[in-house]
Structures are given as structure tokens and as C-alpha cells.
Design a protein with these regions (language model features):
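Extended catalytic cores of very large enzyme megasubunits
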Residues: 1-339
Length: 339
């Protein structure tokens, strides 16, 4: 059977060039066809066109000149849409958002709501970064007279959720848990991805983990000083450790597992826009990949959408005066679609 989809054709209001399939290797084409194409799409160029038209549409009005440029950029491998935009943009499946950052409250209702939110976010194609630093630590009294089991067993629930909920074959559920360096469970948290040592029911082998460092802690490491682990519920010191020993625990875990992520939360909040500070907002964690810092709280789940430029073609796209501006407009439009 002869493929009539060759050369330049009209598609979704713009011109696409099926010959640009050769810009992708076999593995790339096979992956796109297996996971990214929508309904009657048969070629990567059609997916690029769909995402381009979607990214060029603002409040129902499409800028087809922008769509044509976005298609040219993507089909020329100057940049690539994120997985949620390329797989979900312009379709009725999933969301175009790459990352969600949410907050875990210190209550049974809050934990239940967090689990429920994770189900919907993971099955819509987004990666999640959750902040656990305000959940009371192991052994602290609860309002019902019992003793808390701490945050780790509840993280283990999320660990199972990420295996169970995903967006079909396109994107598996993925989650990064963040905790403050002063939390009493920090030593156990550092090692939750290690298969050996400790209770298997308090391991999270399918999660990523990140730690919020502070200027005060880093100074304590430099000074080889003591470091207090403070329960977020009682605000009392539960344990005192050596800061440098804790630092080396993190370094050893990173050598063995590649994680935990480490971010300086003080530096992040120092850079928070003054308009958000005036609203009492605060950065509590980063996202799944430790690349985005946005304010979160119990009422505020942050979102971000992404795309990536290809430095292999820097000499080509760096000469284009509207390339970066077009990508920013595209991402703004994607956020507007989500809203």
C-alpha cells in the first residue's frame, strides 16, 4: 500500500511536511506512534501540528501564523513539547500540565484529600511533588488519644498509588515527597528508597524524595555543630543530632540511590516575588524533578507546563528573533487552556 502522506500537506489549518519524519530516528518515531498519537494520527508530524495549533490558541482564537512557526520549530527538532502537551494537547484525554506541587495537611481528612487528589493528578498525566514537612512525627499524640505513626507509612500509601494510577500507556504515575531537614523523621526519610535496612512497610521504592535545606543547617554543617529535630505539631525538639553526620547520611544515600534531591528552601523563598510574599505565600517544596519552585499551601496546588529547547540546533534557532518569545506565548496559552 502506497503512503499518500508525503511532502507538504494542509493539516489543521497549517502546512506540514511529512518528509520531516526523517529528522527523527526509528526509536523516536516508534515511541511517538506507540504513546503520543491521537485517534486517526499516523505520523509524528500530525502530532506536532496538533500540539502547535493547540499552543497557538488563546481563548478559542487560533493564531495560525504562530501555529505554523511552532510546527516548524518542533518538526525541525529545535525544541520539543512536554509529554502532556504533545500527548494531550488538543485532545479529550488528560491534561497538558507537566507538574503539580501539592501540600499534605496534618490531619486524617487532609491526608485523605491528598490521596484523592493524587489519583486524579497522576491519571491525568502530571508528575507530583508533595510537601510532608508539616505532618507530625512518629510517636506524637493525636487528637484521638493515640500515637501518630508519622508521615512515612502514609508516603508508603502514595508509593502504591503511583503504581496503580497512570495515564494509560503514555505516562506512569510519579511522585516526589519533600521533607524539611529539621523534621524528626528525616533520618528515616533519607533512606526510604534503599531496599535494605528497616521495615519494608516503611519503604517507598517507587517514590522520589527531596529535602529542604536551610541556611541555618548549612552553617551548622560547616561548624560541625548540633542540629535539633523539631516536631512540626508541638514545635519541640524530639532529638538532637550532629549536622555534619546528617549531611553525610544524605551524601551516602545520593551515592547509592541518586537521591534525595537537596534544595535550599531559604534561597527559594528569598527569590519569591514580593507580590506573593504580600499575600502570605511561601515556597515549601519543589516539583517531581526539583526544577520548579512555586508557592503552595492547603488551599493552593501549584502547576507548571514545560518545553525544552534543543542545544544541538543552537546555531540555527539562536538566530531567530522570535523563537523564545513564541515558546513563552505557547506555554502561556497552555496554562490558559488549563485554567
Amino acid at each position: 500500500m502506497v503512503d499518500d502522506k508525503v511532502g507538504i500537506k494542509e493539516y489543521l489549518g497549517i502546512k506540514i511536511n511529512y518528509s520531516n519524519e526523517r529528522n527523527l530516528d526509528k526509536f523516536s518515531l516508534d515511541t511517538l506512534k506507540d504513546r503520543y498519537l491521537w485517534e486517526n494520527e499516523t505520523h509524528a508530524q500530525e502530532a506536532f501540528a496538533r500540539a502547535s495549533v493547540y499552543g497557538a490558541t488563546y481563548k478559542g482564537v487560533t493564531d495560525f501564523e504562530l501555529a505554523q512557526r511552532l510546527y516548524h520549530y518542533s518538526s525541525s527538532c529545535w525544541f520539543m513539547f512536554s509529554t502532556p502537551i504533545l500527548s494531550n494537547g488538543g485532545t479529550s484525554r488528560g491534561l497538558p500540565i507537566s507538574c503539580f506541587l501539592n501540600y499534605v495537611p496534618d490531619s486524617r481528612g487532609g491526608l485523605s484529600n491528598h490521596f484523592d487528589e493524587n489519583i486524579w493528578l497522576a491519571s491525568s498525566g502530571g508528575g507530583i511533588g508533595g510537601f510532608w514537612g508539616d505532618v507530625r512525627s512518629n510517636g506524637i499524640s493525636t487528637a484521638h488519644g493515640s500515637k501518630s505513626t508519622g508521615s512515612i507509612p502514609f508516603m508508603h500509601v502514595v508509593d502504591s498509588q503511583m503504581l496503580a494510577f497512570n495515564q494509560g500507556v503514555t505516562r506512569r504515575g510519579s511522585y516526589a515527597a519533600y521533607m524539611d531537614i529539621s523534621h524528626p523523621e528525616i533520618e528515616e526519610f533519607i533512606n526510604i528508597r534503599k531496599e535494605s535496612g528497616g521495615d519494608i512497610n516503611r519503604k517507598c521504592l517507587n517514590l522520589h524524595n527531596g529535602i529542604n535545606l536551610t541556611n541555618e543547617f548549612l552553617q551548622a554543617v560547616e561548624d560541625d555543630a548540633e542540629w535539633r529535630l523539631i516536631d512540626p505539631k508541638t514545635h519541640e525538639a524530639v532529638k538532637v543530632v550532629n549536622a555534619r553526620d546528617l549531611w553525610w547520611q544524605m551524601i551516602n544515600a545520593r551515592a547509592e540511590t541518586g537521591e534525595p534531591y537537596m534544595i535550599n528552601i531559604d534561597r527559594c523563598n528569598a527569590a519569591l516575588p514580593k507580590e506573593q510574599k504580600a499575600l502570605g505565600l511561601e515556597i515549601k517544596q519543589s516539583n517531581l524533578c526539583s526544577e520548579i519552585t512555586l508557592a503552595t499551601n492547603e488551599e493552593r496546588t501549584a502547576v507548571c507546563c514545560l518545553s525544552s529547547v534543543n542545544l544541538e540546533y543552537f546555531d540555527e534557532w539562536s538566530e531567530n528573533p522570535v523563537f523564545i518569545d513564541d515558546l513563552i506565548t505557547m506555554l502561556d496559552n497552555v496554562i490558559q487552556h488549563y485554567i
